[in-house]
Amino acid sequence: MGKDFYKILGLERKASDDEIKKAYRKLALKYHPDKNKSPQAEERFKEIAEAYEVLSDKKKRDIFDNYGEDGLKGGQPGPDGGGQPGAYTYQFHGDPRATFAQFFGSSDPFGAFFTGGDNMFSGGQGGNTNEIFWNIGGDDMFAFNAQAPSRKRQQDPPIEHDLFVSLEEVDKGCIKKMKISRMATGSNGPYKEEKVLRITVKPGWKAGTKITFPQEGDSAPNKTPADIVFIIRDKPHSLFKREGIDLKYTAQISLKQALCGALVSVPTLQGSRIQVNPNHEIIKPTTTRRINGLGLPVPKEPSRRGDLIVSFDIKFPDTLAPSLQNQLSELLPN
């Protein structure tokens, strides 16, 4: 059963935006690890941040209300429909201090609010086509900024989003078009605008690779917009597992195939199949076969590739007839 973000913040499901902000402010200050030294404070602080991020964002909150945490993180369609599973997937960035700094306009509001200190958090950090929509900001994201003193133009912490790519996309490279919605400031005041950010995913890019778009976050008076950072993540694959530039595949074979040294047909990421074990050697549970050059491209040298590493899952029979057991006992060495 997934988390109940309303319960974490001590709210009813009909809570208003203002009540959500007040609950987060109270609990975040209470459980901030710099102030609260209890062993549970760190985990409680993280739960509170995640609950606020979901409930303060209308899109995330609508999905959570309809599908719960599992639906929110498992890729349910957005509240506007669209019919495509996986059209929106949320993953908490895992940094409750960044949420705290965004909300209060400071990584240390205790000093700013109570001692007059100036300790503001300063951010700053660089095929197939897909379009994904993210709402970058939110009307209440920086509700308490005006209360924190500042002597220079501050920048909000980077806004990070995971960008999931398939192994096929990593193999060939691809282009991702990410449509964002953000607040901008004009002569007539703030307004919402949409913009498409184009990301060229290079062949062989590793999970964890960061693509930074400087100052593409929400705009506000006397503040430098946050950088938007996309982080490459590997989509799970039905056949292969990635290990650096190598690919791992587990072939299912029978005990007969293993003992008789059968040829084993193995798929490749490119769609073809190859025959493994050409010398008809006995295949043991620990046996592996390495096929050179059938892995992923080396990021800085795409003409070079890693290897395809094949391991074997040998299926043993559940039962054997007594007569067959006797034959095997005679035939097989001790």
Swiss-Prot record:
**Pfam families, from UniProt?**
DnaJ, DnaJ_C
GO terms for biological process, alphabetical: chaperone cofactor-dependent protein refolding; positive regulation of crystal cell differentiation; protein folding; protein stabilization; response to heat
Name the domain of life.
Eukaryota
Sorted keywords for this record are: Chaperone, Cytoplasm, Phosphoprotein, Stress response
Concerning Gene3D superfamilies, the annotation shows:
DnaJ domain (1.10.287.110), Urease metallochaperone UreE, N-terminal domain (2.60.260.20)
Which of the residues bear the PTM Phosphoserine? 187
Compartments in which it is found: Cytoplasm
The induction comment states: By heat shock.
Q: Please report the name of this protein according to its UniProt entry.
A: DnaJ protein homolog 1
